[in-house]
Curated annotation (Swiss-Prot):
Pathway participation: Polyketide biosynthesis
Protein name: Trans-enoyl reductase BOA5
Induction: Expression of the botcinic acid clusters genes BOA1-13 and BOA17 is coregulated by BCG1 during both in vitro and in planta growth.
Signal sequence extent: none
Gene expressing this chain: BOA5
Role according to the record: Trans-enoyl reductase; part of the gene cluster A that mediates the biosynthesis of botcinic acid and its botcinin derivatives, acetate-derived polyketides that contribute to virulence when combined with the sesquiterpene botrydial. Botcinic acid and its derivatives have been shown to induce chlorosis and necrosis during host plant infection, but also have antifungal activities. Two polyketide synthases, BOA6 and BOA9, are involved in the biosynthesis of botcinins.
This protein's domain notes: BOA5 is composed of an enoyl reductase (ER) domain and presumably acts in concert with the polyketide synthase BOA6 that misses an ER domain.
Amino acid sequence: MQAVIQTGPGTLQLTENVPKPSVEPGSRKVLVKVHAVALNHSDWKMVDFSAKPGAISGYDMAGVLEAIDDSMNSDLAVGDRVLGVTSIHGGAFAEYVVTDGDLLVKIPENMDFQHAASYGVGIVTTGLALYGNECLALNWPNTDGTGSAAPQKTRVGPRGWSGGDALTDNDNETPRIPVLVYGASTSTGTLAIQLLKLSGYEPIAVCSPHNFGLVQSRGASKCFDYHSQGCGAMIKQYTYNRLEYALDCITTASSMRLCYEAIGATGGKYVSLDPFNARVQRSRADVKPFFCYALTIFGLPIELSGEFARGAKPEDRKLAEKFVKIAEKLIEKGRLKAHPTMLKSGGLGGIASSIDLLRKGKVSGSKLVFDVVGN
């Protein structure tokens, strides 16, 4: 089969005649014939900083089940269309992949493979970041799309907890607790915005102004331009100095600093998707930071260097297995929409050059996807 192989730090190569993987008995794995794949920032970061020569790259894929281990106890069947994340070491950028069946999501009949491929990493990342006990530990959404967040009992501002410009003018409506999403127009950010709304919270977005329409269409009640001087102070004012939760999908010193500035006087929780800045961390003892690394959802040790190394976390695996089933229902009902996608040409052969677009920050508000079948 064809596959995109890591050949060294920062380099990928389309390789022919790579052995087709197979499902080992008792592994609880499945074999997927890949129809489409999507790019993530983790793809270039892994090959640049943690390259494993000979390993197949990629995490996001969508395809058709070709084989299922007999020990699997699930509703999956050969021929099902599925989407998901592959493994700790990647492997999605290939014509076939073996992965964990318990972490896959069935694709609705009305969705194509290109849009389906955009979900995987974002689903498990937001599931862990929003609902994991070490992360924001928020209330989960119900499978019918109704929120379960405990309402704030006392109104703080004239229109509710956080000013509520986009919520209601009705003083009888129960206000929602605000949650800040920095990098709201990323693929993970738009999923987080939707899940927060579905969970009963008020999503507040930070992104570029040209993406305000996108994040508002996904449920953001208020948008802030991160370029604006005093953006953190404006968010603090909007939330009446009581913001407690922030998810940082970008994770730089400046993004972390803005989130810390926005969090209210009583402190709160900050979750990053990359290692965070220690100097900013020390600026506020009342804010509890946590680096959420989504690869822990496989329940296995992560043998990487530095802050990326993690011991096995079986509790994250259990959370992921539970959450993908909720996400599957929400996607099926049209309550959890895919991030905008941009179909690139060349199939697997176009991946190496397109990853450089992510590396250089040339992609905004869309996710790059590639057809595998038919190329």
